[in-house]
Amino acid sequence: MLTLAHYLVLGAILFAMSIVGIFLNRRNIIIILMAIELMLLAVNTNFVAFSHYLGDVHGQIFVFFVLTVAAAEAAIGLAILVTLFRKLDTINVEDLDQLKG
């Protein structure tokens, strides 16, 4: 039987993997966006685990709001990525300072 601690450890591992992914690869914006999405997944896992443990649905409802914000964040991030690639022919984060306006 899986307990709350198992889910919290899973969430902590996912969160740590996303932080490592952001700090080790600061150049590629696609990897950074994927790491941020993984971080939000870890937070959602903890919300659902606590919600189930406490017998309350508020945590599960909050997950839907987080998923909505994550979808909007991914869409905006990919739009910025497409603009960056069209202007500079690269997806390197260090080249973002060359964009003006």
UniProtKB/Swiss-Prot annotation:
EC annotation from Swiss-Prot or TrEMBL: 7.1.1.-
GO BP: any one term: ATP synthesis coupled electron transport
Enzyme superclass (EC): translocase
Gene Ontology cellular-component annotations: NADH dehydrogenase complex; plasma membrane
Membrane topology type: Multi-pass membrane protein
Cell compartment(s), UniProt: Cell inner membrane
Keywords for the protein's UniProt record, in alphabetical order: Cell inner membrane, Cell membrane, Membrane, NAD, Quinone, Translocase, Transmembrane, Transmembrane helix, Transport, Ubiquinone
Reaction catalyzed: a quinone + NADH + 5 H(+)(in) = a quinol + NAD(+) + 4 H(+)(out)
Main location: membrane
Subunit description: NDH-1 is composed of 14 different subunits. Subunits NuoA, H, J, K, L, M, N constitute the membrane sector of the complex.
Listed name of the protein: NADH-quinone oxidoreductase subunit K
Annotated organism of origin: Burkholderia vietnamiensis (strain G4 / LMG 22486) (Burkholderia cepacia (strain R1808))
Gene (name only): nuoK
